[in-house]
Amino acid sequence: MACGATLKRTLDFDPLLSPASPKRRRCAPLSAPTSAAASPLSAAAATAASFSAAAASPQKYLRMEPSPFGDVSSRLTTEQILYNIKQEYKRMQKRRHLETSFQQTDPCCTSDAQPHAFLLSGPASPGTSSAASSPLKKEQPLFTLRQVGMICERLLKEREEKVREEYEEILNTKLAEQYDAFVKFTHDQIMRRYGEQPASYVS
């Protein structure tokens, strides 16, 4: 019987030593109403904390968020700009060559255009005719290729800065709209859940 008593005691005391003891289960209903009463307050506190966090200015988010233009380098290098200018100059020369060859192969158009030019400008002297044809042969460029490349590069940089400013302005506007909508939504949720309940002064 003593052995049976000791075995029975060990079996009876095992639930007391375990984390989920029967005594705690009996005390659980007594503490349930307090936890149920505290749950709306904790939810209200959490919602108020989220509302206060949302009350920050959207400019803080903009300062934390890196700009999408930060890692983007210039799309065209100086060598690429010069290469594009050379190709465009070659295309212009081909276009002029085609125009002059078309005028030479179509004499009817030139013969029809000569009387009108004669009536408008009068008889031309030999010096003026040679001077008029000389710019096609002896055309002096106003800028060198390097200067044209520098001008194009500066224009591209100015255009890039303008696009960046427009993008930042549009982004600020959209973020401000989202911020206002989020604040209004949070305020409506708080008023819908806890607007009818009396104010609580729980510290």
From Swiss-Prot:
Query: In which residues does the motif SYVS motif occur?
Result: 200-203
* Any one Gene Ontology molecular-function term assigned to this protein's record: protein-macromolecule adaptor activity
User: Does the keyword section mention Transcription regulation?
Assistant: yes
List this protein's GO terms for biological process: adaptive immune response; cerebral cortex development; defense response to bacterium; embryo development ending in birth or egg hatching; innate immune response; nuclear protein quality control by the ubiquitin-proteasome system; positive regulation of adaptive immune response; positive regulation of B cell activation
Q: What is a single cellular component term in the Gene Ontology annotation?
A: cytoplasm
Keyword annotations of the record: Adaptive immunity, Cytoplasm, Developmental protein, Immunity, Innate immunity, Membrane, Nucleus, Phosphoprotein, Protein transport, Repressor, Transcription, Transcription regulation, Transport, Ubl conjugation
Instruction: Share the record's PTM remark.
Output: Polyubiquitinated. Polyubiquitination is dependent of UBR5 that extends pre-ubiquitinated AKIRIN2.
Q: Which InterPro entries match?
A: Akirin (IPR024132)
Q: Which CDD domains match?
A: akirin-2
Q: Which residues carry this modification: Phosphoserine?
A: 18, 21, 57
Subcellular location per UniProt equals: Nucleus; Cytoplasm; Membrane
Family label: Belongs to the akirin family.
User: What's the subunit arrangement here?
Assistant: Homodimer. Interacts with IPO9; the interaction is direct. Associates (via SYVS motif) with 20S and 26S proteasomes. Interacts with SMARCD1; promoting SWI/SNF complex recruitment. Interacts with NFKBIZ. Interacts with YWHAB.
Q: Give the note.
A: 'Akiraka ni suru' means 'making things clear' in Japanese. The name is given based on the presence of the clear nuclear localization signal.
Q: What is this protein called?
A: Akirin-2
Species whose genome carries this gene: Homo sapiens
Organism placement in taxonomy: Eukaryota, Metazoa, Chordata, Craniata, Vertebrata
